[in-house]
Amino acid sequence: MVDQTKQTTHFGFRTVAKDEKAGMVAEVFHSVAAKYDLMNDLMSFGIHRIWKRVAIDASGVRRGQRILDLAGGTGDLTAKFSRIVGEKGEVVLADINESMLKVGREKLRDVGIVGNVSYVQANAEALPFPDNYFNCITISFGLRNVTEKEKALRSMFRVLKPGGRLLVLEFSKPLFAPLSKAYDAYSFHVLPKIGQVFVQDAGSYRYLAESIRMHPDQDTLKTMMEEAGFEQVTYTNMTGGIVALHRGFKF
């Protein structure tokens, strides 16, 4: 008898077949890609830029290194890493979603970021790169959309060089009850309305709120990273735990 729990996963609060989730997530990001950056600024009041700056500072990236910006979307981190690694370095912006990758490529080329950046459509669960290839991997607000998170973490571990580090920047669990209540009210009542006004799509932003609630909390994700092989795993809470930055090393 087939264990149905092994064949299903969550899409927001809904239970769906595992082989259907990737397509459903793809539709969300096809819908929002064109105004993704605008919506990030509106939804976070611009604070996402600070969260990403913290991640960049924690990356330890240096000139000449090879970086994977996984689920890199419109290229915010890639743009910064491109300047840091310089001409002899390389940044790979990888995303499973063709629409997001197209927006990211056009955005970076429009501001003259070329030469040391390449673009790859890739599934985090089966990364198409050699073993021990990257000095640093970042995945920013992308892991919660992955169907098989454990599989993706193992794939990241495989392609990371010994001595390299993984940084996972993701929405997490607020630390304080009053903040959690206010955050819930904002997420479930305000975000969908913003989505409806600016991209005529309340459903995608309802999914965003639900997917955040279904994502593992800080300590659970830390354990998942350790089980995938990462060592010295730590995390830093930001904005009261609304976002957490996890960091782990491969030795």
Swiss-Prot record:
Swiss-Prot/TrEMBL GO biological process terms: aerobic respiration; menaquinone biosynthetic process; methylation
Binding site for S-adenosyl-L-methionine: T74, D95, N123, A124, S140
GO MF annotation terms: 2-methoxy-6-polyprenyl-1,4-benzoquinol methyltransferase activity; demethylmenaquinone methyltransferase activity
This enzyme's EC code(s): 2.1.1.163, 2.1.1.201
Enzyme class: transferase
Recorded catalytic activity of this chain's protein: a 2-demethylmenaquinol + S-adenosyl-L-methionine = a menaquinol + S-adenosyl-L-homocysteine + H(+); a 2-methoxy-6-(all-trans-polyprenyl)benzene-1,4-diol + S-adenosyl-L-methionine = a 5-methoxy-2-methyl-3-(all-trans-polyprenyl)benzene-1,4-diol + S-adenosyl-L-homocysteine + H(+)
Record Pfam families: Ubie_methyltran
Pathway the protein acts in: Quinol/quinone metabolism; menaquinone biosynthesis; menaquinol from 1,4-dihydroxy-2-naphthoate: step 2/2; Cofactor biosynthesis; ubiquinone biosynthesis
CDD domains associated with the record: AdoMet_MTases
The entry's keywords: Menaquinone biosynthesis, Methyltransferase, S-adenosyl-L-methionine, Transferase, Ubiquinone biosynthesis
NCBIfam families: MenG_MenH_UbiE, PRK00216.1-1, PRK00216.1-3, PRK00216.1-5
Family, as annotated: Belongs to the class I-like SAM-binding methyltransferase superfamily. MenG/UbiE family.
Record function comment: Methyltransferase required for the conversion of demethylmenaquinol (DMKH2) to menaquinol (MKH2) and the conversion of 2-polyprenyl-6-methoxy-1,4-benzoquinol (DDMQH2) to 2-polyprenyl-3-methyl-6-methoxy-1,4-benzoquinol (DMQH2).
Record-given protein name: Ubiquinone/menaquinone biosynthesis C-methyltransferase UbiE
Species: Photorhabdus laumondii subsp. laumondii (strain DSM 15139 / CIP 105565 / TT01)
Protein's gene: ubiE
